[in-house]
């Protein structure tokens, strides 16, 4: 038993798969646009694709944009997957050309039939305009119809017989052109109103009359030159006629008409000019969408979705891709898609390694111009235009200022979905999540050691290269990280910022403090019990206290690798108050000991210790 809607269901399923990119095994490239599809579907309907895929297994097919336009191919692709051919007078010709190139015979036959019917509709609607005698030669008549293509026309007075024009229009019409009756009347109505304010001149009267044969020849010539927008030809002729008349009337009656009448005529003139511009230009745009209308108005284009204002219609079209999710620019190396062409160009540089923006002071290269600007502001003393209103600190980018402002406001919009901890930066949350997952994506090429933070890998790589960029200002000793330099600097100042909350011993390095707690107190719970026992014991039992720090003095060989934290000499002293009642967790200890560090530095500190 065969299901009646089986074929329709199959087409609908294939179309949904195409739209979502599921199982698509080929990509059609037309200029900067790409279309994903299935080879077997294309080969089933198109002789061109059948022959192409028979000889080649390439997944990317390049089509000539002159023969197959993106909008025309989109219409044909929708027809192949749905069976519905959506066309109008604007895109009919480009669909026909694309179908001929791709050898879709059924579509070609349909387009030819439609074009012939449109030509038949256009000729009668033009020949019924007005069969009157002509007092103008062919050049003058053409000038009156197309004043923009002719030379400057002197101010003349135009008068014509209203009754004859009406008589020509009210002639017999076929059933096919009844729909043109309404727009023709509207144009004649405008002419009738404009004729009331004309001035008659006895010296040089100029009579405009329309010859049916000449109009028919001009219509045929117009169709031969451009088969697009055939249905707009009659409206274009009427608008041009009225425009030429209105220009003459406005010039001849400029000194006698009232201001209100002048405004009305100017409005009519602008309306006709706008209509003609729409007719001649709208067919060249993508699919004649309504989004393109702002280009032909005096107001700036505005996005109907988010209200953003643009200076040009092309900018609005690119912006609309964001709302529609259209990403026509695809990287041929990794298949990643982008909304704009410049985004694709920047992305390709990640594959090629190209860095066209060079710093003139240090010859360092960058893939983006904004990266060069940021580098110059950060490292070469250029102006940092973004200033904090609270502490007057200046920043190179607005994003850095925004992140800094959260320190004053306390805002932490990024929340860990596992433990609920909040962070001020998205990157900090990323580093934090890696503590839960154990992910360490940054791997050393030399020894294979992995790190969760990129800065840790950079510092680690200096061990292999021997680079030591941080130099002590007192003894000129160099170190591989700023954290190691600050730890060394405490040997000159005698500072011991890390204090044990159990026994009160202080250390210059948090690693030494951690080692002390593991050796002497064996965990925070035993440390709390030991501390409470010390407080309750008498002076006679003072011998039960922890051994004196002879075993706490650490040699340089006992130290671990230094921290990779940037601590300037201006940072406040990192002192931890001693609590006699309860011990502190390692996380609380680290947070209290480094109050001036950013979240990424704090996470790195926790990971290392």
Curated annotation (Swiss-Prot):
Main location: nucleus
GO molecular function, one term: zinc ion binding
Keyword hit for Ligase: no
PROSITE patterns per UniProt: BTB (PS50097), ZINC_FINGER_C2H2_1 (PS00028), ZINC_FINGER_C2H2_2 (PS50157)
A single Gene Ontology CC term: nucleus
Compartments, record wording: Nucleus
Zn finger (C2H2-type) location: 301-323, 329-351, 357-380, 386-408, 414-436, 442-464, 470-492, 498-521
Positions occupied by motif Nuclear localization signal: 172-188, 257-262
Alphabetical keyword list: DNA-binding, Metal-binding, Nucleus, Repeat, Transcription, Transcription regulation, Zinc, Zinc-finger
Residues annotated as transmembrane: none
Bias type Low complexity, positions: 533-546
Domain BTB: 24-89
GO biological-process terms attached to the record: regulation of transcription by RNA polymerase II
Residues covered by region (Disordered): 528-553
Protein name: Myoneurin
Species this protein is from: Xenopus laevis
Gene that this polypeptide is encoded by: mynn
């Amino acid at each position: 038993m065969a299901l009646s809607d089986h074929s329709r269901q199959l087409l609908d399923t294939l179309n949904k798969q195409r739209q979502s990119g599921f199982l698509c095994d080929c990509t059609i490239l037309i200029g900067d646009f790409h279309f994903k599809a299935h080879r077997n579907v294309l080969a089933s309907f198109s002789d061109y694709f059948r022959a192409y895929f028979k000889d080649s297994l390439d997944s990317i097919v390049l089509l000539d944009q002159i023969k197959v336009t993106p909008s025309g191919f989109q219409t044909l692709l929708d027809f192949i997957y749905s069976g519905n051919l959506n066309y109008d007078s604007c895109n009919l010709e480009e669909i026909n050309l694309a179908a001929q190139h791709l050898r879709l015979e059924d579509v070609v036959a349909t387009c030819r039939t439609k074009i012939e019917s449109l030509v038949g509709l256009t000729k009668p609607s033009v020949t019924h305009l007005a069969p009157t005698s002509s007092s103008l030669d062919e050049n003058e008549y053409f000038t009156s119809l197309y004043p923009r293509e002719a030379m400057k026309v002197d101010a003349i007075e135009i008068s014509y017989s209203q009754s004859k024009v009406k008589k020509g229009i009210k002639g017999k019409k076929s059933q096919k052109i009844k729909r043109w009756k309404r727009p023709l009347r509207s144009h004649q109505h405008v002419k009738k109103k404009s004729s009331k304010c004309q001035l008659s001149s006895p010296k040089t009267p100029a009579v405009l009359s329309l010859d049916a044969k000449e109009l028919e020849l001009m219509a045929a010539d117009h169709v031969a030159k451009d088969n697009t927008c055939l249905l707009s030809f009659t409206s274009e002729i009427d608008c041009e006629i009225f425009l030429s008349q209105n220009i003459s009337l406005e010039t001849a009656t400029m000194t006698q008409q009232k201001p209100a009448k002048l405004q009305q005529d100017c409005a009519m003139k602008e309306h006709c000019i706008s209509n003609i511009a729409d007719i001649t230009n709208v067919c060249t745009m993508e699919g004649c969408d309504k989004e393109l209308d702002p280009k032909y108005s005096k107001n700036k284009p505005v996005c109907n979705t988010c209200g953003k204002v643009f200076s040009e219609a092309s900018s609005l079209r690119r912006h609309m891709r964001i709302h529609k999710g259209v990403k026509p620019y695809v990287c041929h190396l990794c298949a990643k898609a982008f909304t704009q062409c410049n985004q694709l160009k920047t992305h390709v540089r990640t594959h090629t390694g190209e860095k066209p923006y060079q710093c003139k002071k240090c010859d360092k290269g960058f893939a983006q111009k904004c990266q060069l600007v940021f580098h110059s502001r950060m490292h070469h003393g250029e102006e940092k235009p973004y200033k904090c209103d609270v502490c007057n600190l200046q920043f190179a980018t607005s994003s850095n200022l925004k992140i800094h402002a959260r320190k004053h406001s306390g805002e932490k919009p990024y929340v860990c979905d596992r433990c609920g901890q909040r962070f001020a930066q998205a990157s900090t949350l990323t580093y934090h999540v890696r503590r839960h997952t154990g992910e360490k994506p940054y791997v050393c090429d030399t020894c294979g050691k992995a790190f969760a933070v990129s800065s840790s890998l950079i510092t680690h790589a200096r061990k292999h290269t021997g680079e030591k960029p941080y130099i002590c200002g007192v003894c000129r000793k160099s170190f591989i990280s700023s954290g190691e330099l600050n730890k060394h600097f405490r040997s000159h100042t005698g500072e011991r910022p890390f204090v044990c909350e159990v026994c009160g011993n202080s250390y210059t390095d948090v690693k030494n403090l951690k080692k002390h707690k593991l050796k002497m107190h064996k965990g925070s719970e035993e440390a709390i019990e030991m501390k409470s026992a010390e407080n309750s014991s008498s002076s006679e039992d003072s011998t039960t206290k922890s051994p004196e720090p002879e075993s706490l003095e650490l040699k340089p060989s006992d130290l671990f690798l230094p921290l990779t934290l940037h601590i300037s000499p201006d940072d406040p002293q990192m002192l931890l108050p001693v609590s006699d009642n309860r011990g502190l967790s390692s996380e609380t200890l680290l947070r209290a000991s480094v109050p001036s560090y950013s979240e990424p530095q704090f996470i790195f500190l926790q990971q290392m210790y």
